[in-house]
């Protein structure tokens, strides 16, 4: 990448880092904060690498400039020496010899042609055009811009400096101090001082067609920061548009017709063939592809895990030019399927992990072919049946002979109640332990419900997705609390029955 692309990428990364830091200060859940902090660290590392690359490019450019100057001086001395050897020396004209430092090359025909073309380029100053913009992720986008003035590129080609009228990034937003001639940062400014564009790449200016905008359509809307952000129209009323920005950090706004325009990118349903074949849509973004790439089919839903999050990862990918269904990378040659995480046992070697996975696979295969076994009666905490007498034996035998009665081996609610009625001391202790654990779970669930309610109160009216997520968690916690209450009542009933039997049998 050249110096301009590296500077643009650096500004984009810094803007993304600022958005992540703003999101961290919004008071999110612990899991979302962990993801954002990891993303923050990755962006900082990426910024450091980009700065190092930019410094290396500038250093190499400076060294090449110095070497070129030395080479030109050597060629100029050799040229003077060749002229001195070929031209005859006139003794009478020695005093009229022109010094070497005053010798100037005669202008060539190409230089004269460029001087003749300069007035035509100066006429473009102040004109509105459709100028290209190469983003940091390798896409070519055409934006409406205004020509500031004519300049000459390093290779001598005719170029103009343009300022973009609808900036979507800080790197495209015109610097207000540069327009007044007071900017102190010059090339290091994070705002735009204009971009050099070849005259051959300019296209005619196209006014935005607001008739394409309607309720539910995507658009670009101007925010208070002066940038145009992607949004979606929710309502249209007498020339006023109510838009909802795609970014969760931006609130819903009402704008007029001069602060809204159709999106620069075509919809995802449009094919690349229609993009290249339709000349009327030339103002939209064009993705530069060196060749046709077979992206393959994705058998799994891309970013399916983001139903549990705010989807910051896929939104950053879309901002960097990624199109769903295509592979990663500049030419869409990367992987399509997401990487599935495999959690291995902690503290085990790779051989032991492989052996454990093989055992699990074999168990799954054998378990699928083995018929399900009948569940036994619930084992008692003491591991032995309750004491029985001769009357219990006779009752079981007589009831088993009566038609319509349950079998002796079937575990019925009456039998469970009777077993609990004759429960031993260890069974009562286990019952008390279960009741204590259930009460602890109820207290913990109540604390969770209070915490969720406080978070829901804080986020009401601020973050719609966060509020819905918290409401869902609150409903689940309340359902769990109801189940625990029912379990507690059942355990208390069993405990009272056991206490009643103890009081009636002790004299």
From Swiss-Prot:
Interacts with CHD4/Mi-2; the interaction is direct. GO terms for biological process: negative regulation of DNA-templated transcription; negative regulation of epidermal growth factor-activated receptor activity; negative regulation of transcription by RNA polymerase II. The lineage of its organism: Eukaryota, Metazoa, Chordata, Craniata, Vertebrata. Residues 88-125, 264-283, 359-389, 486-507 are annotated as: Disordered. The modification N-acetylmethionine is found at residue 1. Residues 487-507 have a biased composition (Basic and acidic residues). Transcription repressor that specifically binds the 5'-GGAG[GA]A[GA]A-3' consensus sequence. Represses transcription by recruiting the chromatin multiprotein complex NuRD to target promoters. Negatively regulates expression of EGFR, a gene involved in cell proliferation, survival and migration. Its ability to repress genes of the EGFR pathway suggest it may act as a tumor suppressor. It comes from Rattus norvegicus. The keyword Thylakoid does not apply. InterPro entries: G_patch_dom, Znf-CCCH_4, Znf_CCCH, Znf_CCCH_sf. Residues 309-355 form the G-patch domain. Residues 94-111 have a biased composition (Polar residues). A zinc finger (C3H1-type) spans 170-196. PROSITE patterns: G_PATCH, ZF_C3H1. The modification Phosphoserine is found at residues 272, 349. GO terms for cellular component: nucleoplasm; nucleus; plasma membrane. PANTHER family: ZINC FINGER CCCH-TYPE WITH G PATCH DOMAIN-CONTAINING PROTEIN. The keyword Zinc-finger applies. GO terms for molecular function: DNA-binding transcription factor activity; DNA-binding transcription repressor activity, RNA polymerase II-specific; RNA polymerase II cis-regulatory region sequence-specific DNA binding; sequence-specific DNA binding; zinc ion binding. It comes from the Eukaryota. Residues 112-123 have a biased composition (Acidic residues). This is Zinc finger CCCH-type with G patch domain-containing protein. The modification Phosphothreonine is found at residue 276.
